From Swiss-Prot:
Organism of this sequence: Halalkalibacterium halodurans (strain ATCC BAA-125 / DSM 18197 / FERM 7344 / JCM 9153 / C-125) (Bacillus halodurans)
Alphabetical list of PANTHER family matching this protein: PYRUVATE, PHOSPHATE DIKINASE REGULATORY PROTEIN 1, CHLOROPLASTIC
EC number: 2.7.11.32, 2.7.4.27
Entries under InterPro entries matching the protein: Kinase-pyrophosphorylase (IPR005177), PPDK_reg (IPR026565)
Keywords assigned by UniProt, alphabetized: Kinase, Nucleotide-binding, Serine/threonine-protein kinase, Transferase
NCBIfam families documented for this protein: PRK05339.1
Enzyme's top EC category: transferase
Protein name (record): Putative pyruvate, phosphate dikinase regulatory protein
Annotated binding of ADP, by residue: 153-160
UniProt function note: Bifunctional serine/threonine kinase and phosphorylase involved in the regulation of the pyruvate, phosphate dikinase (PPDK) by catalyzing its phosphorylation/dephosphorylation.
Organismal lineage: Bacteria, Bacillati, Bacillota, Bacilli, Bacillales
Family: Belongs to the pyruvate, phosphate/water dikinase regulatory protein family. PDRP subfamily.
Amino acid sequence: MELGKQRPVVYVVSDSVGETAELVVKAAASQFSGAGIEVRRIPYVEDKETVDEVIQLAKQADAIIAFTLVVPGIRTYLLEKATEAKVETVDIIGPMLEKISSLTKEEPRYEPGIVYRLDEDYFRKVEAIEFAVKYDDGRDPRGIVRADLVLIGVSRTSKTPLSQYLAHKRLKVANVPLVPEVEPPEELFKLSPKKVIGLKISPEQLNGIRAERLKTLGLKSQANYANIDRIKEELAYAEGIMKRIGCPVIDVSNKAVEETANLISSMFQK
């Protein structure tokens, strides 16, 4: 490019963020030598007045307009007015919308920014999963007040897998084990009872689960952890804590994690 010569300009116009159109323009521009082009992004274009302003600016700069406008009225208006002003345009998303509509036999939703809402939903899920890992097994009481939901119960009542499963439903879940020798965190009693779910299980089933756990670890099943009297003591203690909090309680006996998680989800949404 000659010294002092103005770089070619491309206006990127979008009814959302405009990142997609800008990436396409820059990818195309990278195929050319020289000093490149100047990209001027105009996001969130939702009215005809803004379209008129952009067309005027593009005309003055002898620029072209690349756009991703999904709302038909605004897209049509831009095309008509740009043609009248003799400003070149490139419709980046329109042809793809038409082809996919033809392929799927469906009409587009014509909603700006859907892809970013999908991304936001994905990151909420990731955040919830990280939260469940960080505040698993009562390892940090601060998680109790930060959580959408707190699960409480004795060991091996599916608190951890439930926390992970509910995280995939975008819920931030902390869980706290209840052990007779350890006083629960005081934060637990400051929460609304609606934010706490107690998990109970039949002594016999818990005995079997714990015995199998000890076997997996190579330990003797006679250990206190799988002793039926000790289990009944733990369950009675946990029941007392749940009554003290006044939280709803779910019996997880003979229930799959998915079934219990769906019950919790429906309770939480009420």
